[in-house]
Amino acid sequence: MSEILIRNIKRLVQVREPGIDRVAGNAMAELPAIENAFLYLKDGLIHSFGTMDELPSLPTSEVLDATGRFVFPSFVDSHTHLVFAASREEEFVMKIKGATYAEIAGKGGGILNSARKLQQTSEDELVERTLARAHEIIQTGTGAVEIKSGYGLTTRDELKMLRVAKRIGKETPLTVKTTFLGAHAIPAGISHEDYVRQVIEEMIPAVAEDKLADFIDVFCEEGFFTADETERIVEEGKRFGMQPRIHANQLHRSGGVQVGVKTNALSVDHLENIGAEEIEALKNSRVIPTALPGAAFFLGLSFPPARQLIEAGLPLAIASDYNPGSAPSGNMPLMVAFACIKMKMTPEEAINAATLNTSAALAIQHSHGSITKGKIANVYITKPMSSIAYLPYAFGSSLVDRVILNGKIYS
């Protein structure tokens, strides 16, 4: 493996000692950094760092000068639907004209629209289309990503989606974690209870047999899956070795947060509709509350109450929800900007939420999410910037200049 020395870094950001796996509450406002720093990457890992005054003589195959630039750990995007067959901009226009999410779904749009398109698309075609999106998110600073199924809605097509996600992990330098989301919607031609039974009795064992999913997820929402159904499904997934994560409280007070706490989910995601009861439940758990500001922005929903979550001492995370219907962007710097502008998070809180806390939401906090000795060498170098706050402030600018993943310069 090659060695890379990055020198003259204006500010090396998110520098952590080993063992810090998440930051919560008031601690989210603290983002440790080193001024005028160097960072040495060796054998695909973070080897050492410090101030330029402390720079020893090091064997290097490549030296990068970062004068005037910041270096951050790569973003960890803990919630995406990166595998899909086609965009849905026709629904975007319907929304502009006043149609609601539920009305679009009722006319055969929404998730079922994506399912029809995906079922008609070959695995190789899906890989090709998803690869383009994977390289797009790498260029905006993402180094690790969760990818869900959920647009198959048949056993064959759910397995196809998860195989595609696994291939993205092999054919790109991204760290990929996979989630089985068969319980995303009820397909046409089958009763609600019969489909729940199919997910539990047929899909979960098939996914587990092929070792295709790290996690299991359910869209716990009115008109989709109840809290009781969500619990049944994720408990069966746990029996097959899949850790739960739950789509919770996006459109209504669905009970998803409480199910997530009860089933020891890694995360509960969305949270546009939560109150004191849900926050109190989260306070007594290790579940990571995850906001998806891109979806709230795109759908015109209320944003998750970030300040209340942080003031309750919780470790808030931020992910993109990249999908063709409600969040057609995997641009994590933009999500950080939305968190600051619309959720009133400070830049430091938002960066913590999109790196260390999302790594905890994927159970990869020991290898990703911070500048820590021994972690995987996933970092990006910015264009010249004046401060950390400039990243979300200049929300329309592309400020990621160079990306290094697994200790190799991405090009």
Language-model features: locations:
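Metal-associated gating/positioning segment near the N- to mid-region
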Residues: 61-62, 66-129
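C-terminal cap of metal-dependent C-N hydrolases
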Residues: 23-28, 356, 376-411
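Divalent metal-coordination and catalytic microenvironments
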Residues: 9, 39, 44, 68, ...
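His/Asp/Glu-enriched, well-ordered alpha-helical/loop segment
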Residues: 239-244, 262-263, 300-384
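N-terminal metal-binding scaffold of metallo-dependent hydrolase/deaminase domains
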Residues: 1-57
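Metal-coordinating catalytic core of metallo-dependent amide/deamination hydrolases
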Residues: 114-129, 135, 143-255
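Conserved beta-strand scaffold positions in the cores of enzyme catalytic domains, especially
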Residues: 5, 61-65, 178, 403
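Catalytic core of soluble alpha/beta enzymes
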Residues: 195-209, 223-311, 327-329
